[in-house]
Amino acid sequence: MATTAAASPPAIATALSALLRRQRRRSSRCVGASHARCLAADANAEAVAPSRRGGHGGTRLEEAVPAGEGRSRIDAWISARLGGGGVSRARIQASIRAGLVVVNGRPVSKVSHMVKGGDIVSCTVLELQPLRAEPEDIPLDIVYEDDHLLVVNKPAHMVVHPAPGNANGTLVNAILHHCKISTFTCLARNSIDDECPDSSDDDIDVFDIDQFTTGEVSSEVREALVRPGIVHRLDKGTSGLLVVAKDEHSHAQLAEQFKLHTIRRVYISLTCGAPNPNSGRIEVPIARDPNNRIRMIATPGSGHRYARHAASRYKVREVFAGGGSALVEWRLETGRTHQIRAHAKYLGIPLLGDETYGGTKSMALSLLRPRTPSRYHCDLSNMISKIDRPCLHAALLGFKHPHSGKILEFSCPPPDDFTEVLNELHQVTLASNGNSGGGVARICD
């Protein structure tokens, strides 16, 4: 069960230390897409009526690449032609992969296909699809609630908001039921699928519950809003604290605090390896990995076109197995998609269980097994095999109440799957005491 402190809470560091002390005592006892609309024009600026192809609704673009124009990627060329219609590059790429783009009479499927002067391009951009979310009686671990907001301890493996193909079982479905809000239908905003998404792991969203008490809202609002109540997000695999706004004023005030970076956010993670030095600040921009759209990359020097400023502070709380793993605390200055995960990979310490960013089971074992006695290798293998998500938990959250102005801070211990791995690492490390000094747990205060 999550623990809370409101109005006059202990300092975040004190609260986190208390959580860690509890875990140490416990372990010591054990020793022994939605889509957007677009308008298109042909080379003569003549409007083209919407049409359908292959069952997909959309607006067509049919145009010749001007003679003498240099070679261009097909996705970039279409994006330049339709940019005024608010069409994202990601939506164009999805249309290409769906076989809805034809060059000189032949369908193309690669977004990197090159076009040149004289080529005839025919394109049907995927049409916007509505998202519908139903209230669902899903248990919520509510840490705090009043008339204006609630703070929820999100379990790992729960998606925060509905998306095409994933409209049920989300935190939004649970909130709709808890707050007794009827079904709503809305359209996904462009940024969700953009190459450079504005929303992120722990950044602001742009809506609140009140705006979705009915299924009918203006097209302008529907294009901007999609997930009721959620002010910021956590990845599906991340557990921990989220604040949810119940009214427009609360949402606006909380969103402003996120923009001003006055929200206090502390995460804890288990990593593959230990960072050196054991504390520091990372200020490295983050962008979408051009080779893998589900992954972000830290890009020093901001050379990437879509890179966005990102800054994180980290501190090692404990080191296990002579550096085979570590408990690392993170404090976010910005909130980009996968920020902690991308920065951890950049430091060479991917999160334990984060297969997307290199924290694979094989990597974890390659770091831990050589540093622990052989009698614990079987236990280590069993422990690692059970990890099914990145070991990342949003442990502490602090902000100013949007109505009263009081400072609220909340702490929440990590869930069982996280603590089981933490306890196992404690056991292996403490029981290895005397193994050439490499197995002694090192606590960093």
Swiss-Prot record:
Any one GO biological process: enzyme-directed rRNA pseudouridine synthesis
Broad class of enzyme this protein falls into: isomerase
GO molecular function, one term: pseudouridine synthase activity
Gene3D superfamilies: Pseudouridine synthase (3.30.2350.10), RNA-binding S4 domain (3.10.290.10)
Originating species: Oryza sativa subsp. japonica
Feature: transit peptide: 1-44
Name of the featured protein: RNA pseudouridine synthase 2, chloroplastic
Top-level taxon of origin: Eukaryota
Family: Belongs to the pseudouridine synthase RluA family.
SMART domains for this protein: S4
Keywords: Chloroplast, Isomerase, Plastid, RNA-binding, Transit peptide
Main location class: plastid
Catalytic activity: a uridine in RNA = a pseudouridine in RNA
A Pfam family recorded for this sequence: S4
Region annotated Disordered, chain positions: 47-66
Alphabetized InterPro entries for the sequence: PsdUridine_synth_cat_dom_sf (IPR020103), PsdUridine_synth_RluA-like_CS (IPR006224), PsdUridine_synth_RsuA/RluA (IPR006145), RluA_PseudoU_synthase (IPR050188), S4_RNA-bd (IPR002942), S4_RNA-bd_sf (IPR036986)
PROSITE patterns: PSI_RLU, S4
Positions annotated as active site in the UniProt record: 235
